[in-house]
């Protein structure tokens, strides 16, 4: 869902798309940054005995909040571009999903480094650059601050581009 939003936002900013169609804006999710989760997986593999862990940020945010943050980051009003389409409602959707990573914090000494607002900025910046636009630049600064030089911004943009829709069609 988040990537659908940030790709569409970039396409809207580039005048390649007019509308983003979404379903339930009130669904809450615990969105996190994949490299943080890979770090947690590495720590799991260092354990002497196998165990189960829940990995997440421990924060839940709605799709509506994501729209507010993503479009607001570019000083845009999402209400002008987002349309609700009932076909995107999921009949069996769980409305609220939030991880409890307390065991991972305690046993693995693991903490996520990237949280909601920063994740959104990383994604928006990367998708703007993928479509050929200049980004505000906060994403690269956030990655450098929290992950240092091992995680390069250009790698972030390239890895996101591997999954991008370059067809020019609207993201619905």
Predicted regions and their residues:
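C-terminal substrate-binding subdomain of Rossmann-fold SDR/epimerase-dehydratase oxidoreductases
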Residues: 1-172
């Amino acid at each position: 869902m988040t990537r659908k939003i940030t790709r569409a936002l970039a396409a809207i900013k580039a005048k390649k798309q007019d509308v983003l169609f979404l379903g339930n804006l009130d669904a809450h999710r615990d969105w996190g940054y994949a490299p943080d989760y890979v770090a947690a997986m590495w720590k799991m593999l260092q354990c002497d005995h196998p165990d189960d862990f829940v990995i997440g940020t421990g924060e839940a945010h709605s799709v509506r909040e994501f729209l507010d943050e993503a479009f607001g980051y570019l000083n845009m009003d999402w209400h002008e571009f987002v349309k609700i389409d009932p076909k995107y409602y999921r009949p069996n959707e769980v409305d609220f999903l939030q991880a409890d990573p307390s065991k991972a914090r305690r046993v693995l000494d693991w903490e996520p480094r990237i949280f909601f607002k920063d994740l959104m900025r990383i994604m928006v910046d990367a998708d703007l650059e993928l479509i050929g636009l200049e980004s505000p630049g906060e994403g690269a600064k956030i990655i450098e601050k929290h992950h240092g030089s091992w995680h390069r911004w250009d790698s972030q943009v390239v890895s996101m581009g591997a999954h991008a829709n370059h067809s020019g069609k609207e993201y619905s």
